[in-house]
Amino acid sequence: MPNENQKPNLYSLFSNGHLQTIWTSIVGKYTLKKTSKFFFTRTRFKTPDNDFLDFDWLVNKKKTESSTLLVLFHGIEGSSDSQYSLAFANIAIENSWSFVVINFRGCSGEINLAPRAYHAGDTEEIDWVLKKIDSIVTADTIFCVGISLGGNALLKWLSMHDRALYSNLSRLKAIAVVSAPLDLVSSGKKLENEVNGIIYSRFFLRTMKKKAKHKWNQFPGLFDLENVICAKTMKQFDNSFTAPVHKFLNVHDYWKKSSSIDEIKFITSHSLIVNAKNDPIVPSFNIKDLNITSENVEYWNPNFGGHVGFSSKINLKKFESQFLWMPRMIGNWFLKTHKTQ
């Protein structure tokens, strides 16, 4: 469990979940792009369905592969350009790790080719990615971190991996998920809140609708385009696009089958679940709700952090703050956990 004494230094104003979320997303990205002295190189891999996935690797100036690789699965409409991707890249550099961000389909700046996109329960995609990585890297140790939607998919995959429903990846030593919507139904309801709908749903839908239009142009009739264009909530979008495109009956079927909350009891691998109590998108869970059965699964529920926020040492005069607090804590947890194995 991360040290409870390691808490972010926040102004009371920024203890608000919305402000934590928005500040980190906007100012964090600007600050990290300005201060980070690294760049990514892209490798494109052909998928089994004749599509492609882009893996963005942190360029290693030492030209030697690290014995440890950190793999990041991003959140909804994220990419290697997201604030948290840049933050974890910095942590990888601090620890001399290799680092790669997996851009989900359609998230690397180019529309994918197949009649599909990405979704919160795509365990087959996670499995294919990790097996591909396992086949091409020489690192002795692999850690994975999943952010929001990517965290839910990663956690659901791990539960299946630990039940031997997917082949064993012996070099995978631990995973961490941050702000993951473990229960998509309750998260969906929270996004339908009037304030959340205005702030977050409209933001996500702006780009998701554009991608959906491109997908319809590729595959006319794949879904009801008019319903997608008219969608005003994530629930409506998932019911009109995500569910039918990925062979779910409807949004309720998609959310129920893709949620990881009922899968956690099957996990035996070293795992850390981090959800802030003031997350405006993901409900805060009581540890009893998660039905954790293994001592290897840890749950941390800090008071502050928002949705993938967790900024600290906020200085309004200089319009800056520290955005590496949570990624650094997770990096330290990976190191500590691996030492005890």
Regions found by a protein language model. Name each.
Residues 17-62, 318-320:
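N-terminal cap/lid segment of alpha/beta-hydrolase-fold proteins
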Residues 66-75:
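Short beta-strand element of the alpha/beta-hydrolase
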Residues 78-90, 284-285:
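The serine-hydrolase catalytic nucleophile loop
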Residues 81, 89-113:
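Conserved alpha/beta-hydrolase
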Residues 105-143:
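Catalytic nucleophile-loop/oxyanion-hole region of alpha/beta-hydrolase
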Residues 135-139, 143-245:
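Alpha/beta-hydrolase-fold enzymes
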Residues 267, 273-275, 279:
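Short beta-strand/loop motif that positions the catalytic acidic residue
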Residues 305-323:
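Catalytic histidine-centered segment of alpha/beta-hydrolase-like enzymes
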